[in-house]
Each structure stands twice: as structure tokens, then as C-alpha cells.
């Protein structure tokens, strides 16, 4: 059962809540998520299971696609509706033109300060833990890239946005900073993740669907097998003898199986589609197995 289960995370659950639930359903402790979703958020939460947990390192900067609802009129401590108001509530009447002009500042590459209430670490502690103790937290800005930021709808003080962004981008910060730029305050009211890396919403199962599959002994139906993960990495097909050598740490060439891939990493895969290892280039046309399955 090595692979990824894509969950449609329900609102109100932490990502760790979902991991614990799937551990019980799949009857294994080897489950982890590939990127936190806030409790108020729903949508795509990919979970690595069994030996595929070894591949999590390759997903840390996966691009994301979100659809979010921003409420203008006041800001909050967490930059979303779960936080305490930090500004006086004001009546807001924005035009689409005003909003489009402000959105232009949040497209492309820029420095973004993460919310104080986040999973970022400060001297070894999660910043949200410090914030809950009323300790002052101001995280350093980080470079993010927003490839697309589209205004889908504007009604009253609510704006629906769609964003395609780099890993590590906070939609809560975009909402908060947008309110600051417009001088009226704002926070994130709703958030749905439509895609995370190669995983999309149409692949996602609810926890109830996953439980039903497990009850019918059909849990593998919900798993994207390890051999199909990381499609951006070129595949090098190997026979069983070479596969055994790679599992023992032996370097392997890309040819004669295929021409040298223009990639730092390749996947060593058997003819039956099983992932043997992820290889990292060490010499032209020679790869070292950095992760062995």
C-alpha cells in the first residue's frame, strides 16, 4: 500500500486530525501529510502512506491552487475568521476596479510575512504555540511566487479569489495584506485547496468514502501507487537484477534505458511499474539512489 491517498479535508479538522483518522482506517502508523491545511480550510490534502513517506521531502515546495473568500472591513489576529478582531469594524464598499488595482501588488514574486498564528517555527517552537501564550511573534518575510491571482466575484464586502502560488504561500497573509493595502482591514473567511502539486480535487476522497472502501477491503482503490508519483521526474526502467543492485546502494546510469534526462532526479522503476528508488545525479548520466523504497 505504498503511495498517496488524496483526502478532501473537512472544515474544522486539523491536518493532524486527518492523519490520525487515516492511520486508524488504514491500520498503519506510517501516514503523513504533504502540506498543512488550516482548520477552516477544506480540499486537497495528500497523505503519504507506508514507504511513500520517504518521498515527502520532494513535495515541500509543491505549487498550490486555492479558491478563497476574503471579508473586508476588519482584520483578525490569525488573519482568518477564527481569530480575534484586531481593528475596528468599518463599512466597506469596494469596486472591482479598486480591488483589481490592489491585487496587482500580490502577483509575481514578492516577500510575504507569514501569520503569527502558523506552523512556522521560532526557536524550535511553533509560532501558534507562542501566540496562544500572548507572546509577541513576528516572523521574517519569505519569498513567495503567485503565478495567478484572479478576482472571481465581488459582492458587498466579500471577494472570491482564485490563486495559483508557490509552496509556502499563505492565503491568510494575502487576505490580511490586501486589507492593509486598501486601508479597511480584511481576513480570510473561507478557503478551499483545489490542487497541491500533482494532486487535484477530482482525485480526493472524503473520510467517509475512505472508511467505506476499507470496510469493503478496497482501500488500494484510493491509493496513487508510488510508481506513479513525482511525474516530473523522468523514469529509468530497470530489470530485476539492476533493481536489486540499486536497493543495495549501487549507482545506476540513465542509458541505455533512455537518453540522459534533463533532471537532477530520476525514478528507477521496474517494468511492472514499481518504484525502486529516486536517483540524484552525481556524474553526467550517472545517478545515486538517495531514497530507496
Swiss-Prot record:
GO molecular function per UniProt: RNA binding; tRNA pseudouridine(55) synthase activity
Reactions accelerated catalytically: uridine(55) in tRNA = pseudouridine(55) in tRNA
InterPro entries linked: PsdUridine_synth_cat_dom_sf (IPR020103), PsdUridine_synth_N (IPR002501), tRNA_psdUridine_synth_TruB (IPR014780), TruB_C (IPR032819)
Domain of life: Bacteria
Active-site residues from the entry: 38
Database matches in Gene3D superfamilies: Pseudouridine synthase
Assigned keywords, A-Z: Isomerase, tRNA processing
One GO biological process term: tRNA pseudouridine synthesis
EC number(s) on file: 5.4.99.25
Coiled coil residues, start to end: none
The protein's enzyme class: isomerase
Family recorded in the similarity comment: Belongs to the pseudouridine synthase TruB family. Type 1 subfamily.
HAMAP family membership: TruB_bact (MF_01080)
Functional description taken from the UniProt entry: Responsible for synthesis of pseudouridine from uracil-55 in the psi GC loop of transfer RNAs.
Protein name, UniProt field: tRNA pseudouridine synthase B
Organism, as annotated: Solibacter usitatus (strain Ellin6076)
Organism lineage string: Bacteria, Pseudomonadati, Acidobacteriota, Terriglobia, Bryobacterales
Amino acid at each position: 500500500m505504498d503511495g498517496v491517498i488524496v483526502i478532501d479535508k473537512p472544515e474544522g479538522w486539523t491536518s493532524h486530525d486527518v492523519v490520525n483518522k487515516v492511520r486508524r482506517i488504514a491500520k498503519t502508523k506510517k501516514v503523513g501529510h504533504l502540506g498543512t491545511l488550516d482548520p477552516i480550510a477544506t480540499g486537497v490534502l495528500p497523505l503519504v502512506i507506508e514507504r511513500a513517506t520517504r518521498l515527502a521531502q520532494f513535495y515541500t515546495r509543491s505549487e498550490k491552487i486555492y479558491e478563497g473568500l476574503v471579508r473586508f472591513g476588519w482584520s483578525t489576529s490569525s488573519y482568518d475568521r477564527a481569530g480575534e478582531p484586531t481593528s475596528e469594524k468599518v463599512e466597506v464598499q469596494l469596486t472591482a476596479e479598486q480591488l483589481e488595482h490592489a491585487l496587482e501588488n500580490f502577483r509575481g514574486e514578492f516577500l510575504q510575512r507569514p501569520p503569527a498564528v502558523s506552523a512556522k517555527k521560532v526557536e524550535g517552537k511553533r509560532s501558534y504555540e507562542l501566540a496562544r501564550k500572548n507572546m509577541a511573534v513576528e516572523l521574517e518575510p519569505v519569498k513567495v511566487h503567485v503565478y495567478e491571482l484572479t478576482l472571481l466575484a465581488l459582492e458587498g464586502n466579500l471577494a472570491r479569489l482564485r490563486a495559483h502560488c508557490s509552496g509556502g504561500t499563505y492565503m491568510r497573509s494575502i487576505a490580511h495584506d490586501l486589507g492593509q493595502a486598501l486601508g479597511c482591514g480584511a481576513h480570510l473567511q473561507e478557503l478551499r485547496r483545489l490542487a497541491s502539486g500533482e494532486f487535484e480535487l477530482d482525485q480526493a476522497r472524503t473520510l467517509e468514502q475512505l472508511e467505506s472502501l476499507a470496510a469493503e477491503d478496497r482501500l488500494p482503490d484510493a491509493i496513487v501507487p508510488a510508481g506513479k508519483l513525482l511525474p516530473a521526474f523522468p523514469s529509468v526502467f530497470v530489470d530485476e537484477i539492476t533493481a536489486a543492485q540499486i536497493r543495495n546502494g549501487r549507482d545506476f546510469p540513465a542509458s541505455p534505458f533512455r537518453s540522459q534526462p534533463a533532471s537532477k532526479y530520476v525514478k528507477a522503476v521496474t517494468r511492472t511499474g514499481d518504484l525502486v528508488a529516486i536517483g540524484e545525479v552525481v556524474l553526467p548520466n550517472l545517478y545515486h539512489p538517495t531514497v530507496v523504497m
